[in-house]
Every structure is written in C-alpha cells, then in structure tokens.
Swiss-Prot record:
UniProt keyword annotation of Metal-binding present: no
InterPro entries named in the record: NADH_UbQ_OxRdtase_chain4L/K (IPR001133), NUOK/Mnh_C1-like (IPR039428)
Keyword set, alphabetical order: Electron transport, Membrane, Mitochondrion, Mitochondrion inner membrane, NAD, Respiratory chain, Translocase, Transmembrane, Transmembrane helix, Transport, Ubiquinone
Chief site of localization: mitochondrion
GO molecular function: NADH dehydrogenase (ubiquinone) activity
PANTHER family: NADH-UBIQUINONE OXIDOREDUCTASE CHAIN 4L, NADH-UBIQUINONE OXIDOREDUCTASE SUBUNIT ND4L
Top-rank taxon, per record: Eukaryota
Residues spanning the membrane: 1-21, 31-51, 61-81
Organism listed in the record: Chalinolobus tuberculatus (New Zealand long-tailed bat)
Gene (UniProt): MT-ND4L
Enzyme class: translocase
Protein name: NADH-ubiquinone oxidoreductase chain 4L
Record-linked Pfam families: Oxidored_q2 (PF00420)
Places the protein is found: Mitochondrion inner membrane
Length: 98
C-alpha cells in the first residue's frame, strides 16, 4: 500500500472519528461528513485512474453529485434549525418532526 492510499485512509478514519466524537453541533457533523466524502472522492478517483476501466470513469462524478446534494440538504437543515431555535444542536432535530 502506497503512502498516498495510507494518507487517504487516515483522513477517512479521522473524519469518521470526528463524526462519532463531536455529535453535539450540526455544523461540526456536516464538516466531518464533508471530510468523509472528500476522502472517498480522492480514493475513488485514484482507483479509477489505476484500473483504467471505461465503466468506472463516471463514478467520481456521481460521487460529487451526491456530495453536492448532501451539502445542500445539510446546509438547508442547518439554516432551518438555527433560525427556529437559535442554536445548531443535533438534539434539536428531534423537535422538527411533525
């Protein structure tokens, strides 16, 4: 395993550990999720470049589309929670249920 793959795996595990540890604020959870998606994007891009298979060329682009949708939904949820309650605690998400 090369040093590049090891660094990407370290970034993924650090983001996952941050997501598990800092669950109180929604903004920190969203930042950790973005770190996870960014490391997955770099890993899939490197894998596609090494495999050279034509069927997998669109995989990083599809992952970026899902990451953009995830970021947009997360930011809109952050705006709704902060406008409604004034804080961005994750425990306030239970209060948004109908």
């Amino acid at each position: 395993m090369s040093l590049t793959y090891l660094n990407i795996m370290l970034a993924f595990s650090t983001s996952l550990l941050g997501l598990l540890m800092y669950r109180s604020h929604l903004m920190s959870s969203l930042l950790c999720l973005e770190g996870l998606v960014l490391s997955l994007f770099v890993l899939t891009t490197l894998m596609v470049l090494t495999i050279n298979l034509t069927l997998t060329n669109l995989l990083p682009i599809i992952l970026l589309v899902f990451a953009a949708c995830e970021a947009a939904l997360g930011l809109s949820l952050l705006v709704v929670v902060s406008n409604t309650y004034g804080v961005d605690y994750v425990q306030n998400l239970n209060l948004l249920k109908c």
